[in-house]
């Protein structure tokens, strides 16, 4: 907690100094001094570019640019007829800091405060050195390039208030670790090919020893010590290939694998090496002159679980989501020149224990699915007002009648 408080204070001081410095020049022409850098939409972009493709604010000759976003909402939820009433949620307040250190050398960090200050995380803090467009070195705290949502998760981008179930529990976004790696892109006419490959610290034994009483990669990432040491003493590998066509869309295939358990300590062998692996496929496309957008992702998890564990802890998991969003109105509204009204729907599913019981042969349940209709108003591209209704069904391990949940949500998200 002391570390989190220290980070918060230093970040706050930096923002205050930035604002004070800009205010001290208020008597001059601030339109020349203060410059807003919008997200770059002029070039073909992949999900791997999302970390830098954000709006920033610079001031004069300061060597740093800042930005961020805020998410807040209210919701009313009811499960099997039981409700705790309305709640207001300040979900995320995120700050970005970027700097060009020298030619072809740059730095970016992302600091996120969740639920007020309940969680404070450095989600990204890395230096990039470009030797060639196909060969860039990145090191520090990096986002593991598994799936697309883990890389492209900023709230203002999405018309849905909740993050996808599979992006929280199957792939535990936002997943970051300390490490190094390479990335690059290659352009050919309308095509762009990108790759990323990193070696980082990985998960720990909490994958199979947690309060959820199931196999959970989300529980395995909660250990803050992963930023200073590897629990297994071995690196975790994450790699991704992505290809994009200007007219068709983007397809990405990614893989992550590593030993998660403490198999050796002080030279003594405690257990065999047990791995956790994830294979993910993501895609996105735009149709009808960008008025219809389809985004999706599926992921399969493989975990080596000790034979002494019961089947409550699954060796395989699967999940995914698909968002279909259409623009039904785009015009000047209340003084906003290019305001948009979108309608959409999200379909999502997660199975935390694929397989059947050894004794009975019956199917193991422990799954959840949901459908989420959405109405979103975008006065400008960086701000969204969202209204969602969420209907979900969740079954326990034995497949008993599912718990039925309905959630009404209204909120906003904006870059600043």
Region spans (language model):
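Bacterial Sec-dependent N-terminal signal peptides
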Residues: 1-30
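N-terminal periplasmic/intermembrane-space "pro-region" immediately following the signal or transit peptide
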Residues: 23-71, 416
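Outer-membrane beta-barrel pore domains
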Residues: 29-40, 81-82, 125-130, 150, ...
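Outer membrane beta-barrel
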Residues: 53-205, 233-238, 242-250, 321-327, ...
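A generic structural micro-feature
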Residues: 60, 87, 119, 172, ...
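Extracellular/periplasm-exposed beta-strand and loop segments of Gram-negative cell-envelope proteins
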Residues: 152-154, 166-172, 208-212, 224-230, ...
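A short, charged helix-loop
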Residues: 195, 199-203, 213-222
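Loop-centered beta-sheet repeat module
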Residues: 214-264
